[in-house]
Regions:
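Donor nucleotide-activated moiety binding/catalytic core segment of transferases
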Residues: 78-91, 247-283, 287-288, 299
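Short N-terminal targeting/anchoring amphipathic segment
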Residues: 31-33, 88-104
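Conserved catalytic-core segment of nucleotide-activated headgroup transferases in glycan assembly
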Residues: 39-50, 170-171, 179-255, 354
């Protein structure tokens, strides 16, 4: 969306949010803006249904993931046709919880008693985002101001470590006073059962008898740059392994595994080794004590186009490979030497994180 269209959209949202008055609602109202169900659904489920009215604004693609919660929440699909409905819901909310960058918030006229809390869709960051993303033309003052308006709408950030706090400060212009060191709701699933038992049960369910290598690369805007690993060649060279390619849903590959129905966290729970690149998933995998090999065939290009941060550049070279042959050789020769690199990113991620988050919401919304 170009700068002029964004400017017009923000103007429309600003006018509507000033015209629309808050609806009178019997119970405190919380609105969730959801792109990633794994970040939002744990909070929805944990909140007491009798205390709150809950509304979810989400994409048409993600709306089906809320079917199990249909009795507990109102769902509004985020389309241009429902813009007025979205703003009406926002205006009556005491708290708005988001998991991503939402352009609407750059024009939304927040009321004085509203708070917006960001639960970012990742446990950490190895690539640049926000205003540090090289794709943002920082010399274009209008473009930068449009981004800032969206970022400045957020009052608080849920974080699991100081490193992610640092990323928010660098990339989004956040301050230390905005950090809520409660941990992240997305990690709650890893504390709800014995991991070894869950891993064995899942492997049995999906018929996996070997060690599982999971390839979860980050998304590249040029779809031609998104690669799957040759499954047949990998498994021929490493007969003790089963490989699953889990590419971005928008990437069409007729010759790779159809695992679209299995969410990434379930695949990670089954995995023995992660293969990734600039994604945040290696950070999340470290919480499960799963090592990662970084298959970074386009490292130089990606760094130039998007940017890789100081945490990526601190990864030891022994964990990086640039070809499939080197990847296979590293697993053959060094597998026993690899260990998770990012355990210190989980200082505040605990089995009590979700409870701390809901306690905070109760305190802020019902006071």
């Amino acid at each position: 969306m170009n700068v002029l269209i964004k400017k017009f959209y923000h103007l429309v949202v600003r006018i509507l949010s000033k015209m629309i008055t808050p609806q009178v609602i019997d119970k405190p109202h919380i609105v969730f803006m959801m792109t990633f169900p794994e970040d939002i659904k744990p909070i929805i489920k944990a909140l007491n249904n009798s205390l709150y009215q809950k509304t979810v604004l989400t994409t048409p693609k993600q709306a089906p993931y809320l079917s199990e919660l249909s009795d507990d929440v109102d769902v509004i699909e985020m389309t241009n046709r429902t813009l007025v409905k979205q703003i009406k819901a926002l205006k009556s909310a005491q708290m708005i919880i988001i998991d991503n960058y939402y352009l609407l918030l750059g024009g939304y006229n927040k009321t004085s008693n509203q708070r917006i809390v960001q639960t970012w869709h990742a446990s950490g960051a190895l690539k640049n985002f926000g205003l540090t993303d090289h794709q943002v033309d920082v010399s274009d003052k209008v473009m930068v101001q449009q981004y800032r308006k969206v970022y400045q709408a957020t009052d608080f950030y849920l974080v699991g470590c100081e490193q992610m706090s640092q990323c928010f400060k660098q990339s989004l212009g956040a301050t230390e006073e905005q950090m809520l060191y409660f941990g992240l709701p997305r990690i709650n699933k890893y504390y709800t059962a014995d991991r070894a038992t869950v891993k064995a049960e899942l492997k049995d369910k999906y018929g996996i008898t070997n060690k599982l290598a999971l390839y979860v690369p980050t998304y590249r805007e040029d779809k031609a740059d998104n690669r799957a690993i040759d499954k047949a060649y990998f498994e021929k060279c490493l007969p003790g392994y089963t490989l699953i390619n889990k590419l971005h849903p928008s990437i069409e590959h007729s010759d790779i595994d159809d695992v679209s129905s299995i969410d990434t966290s379930t695949l990670m729970l089954m995995s023995d080794i992660i293969i990734s690149d600039y994604s945040s998933l290696p950070i999340e995998a470290s919480l499960l004590d799963i090592p990662t090999i970084f298959y970074v065939y386009d490292e130089g290009t990606y760094d130039k186009v998007r940017g890789l941060n100081q945490f990526y550049k601190a990864i030891p070279d022994s964990y990086k490979v640039y070809t499939e042959e080197d990847l296979i050789m590293t697993i053959q020769e060094k597998e026993h030497l690899l260990s998770p690199l990012f355990k210190d990113w989980h200082k505040y991620n605990t089995d009590k994180s979700l409870h701390q988050i809901t306690e905070y919401i109760d305190k802020m919304v019902t006071k």
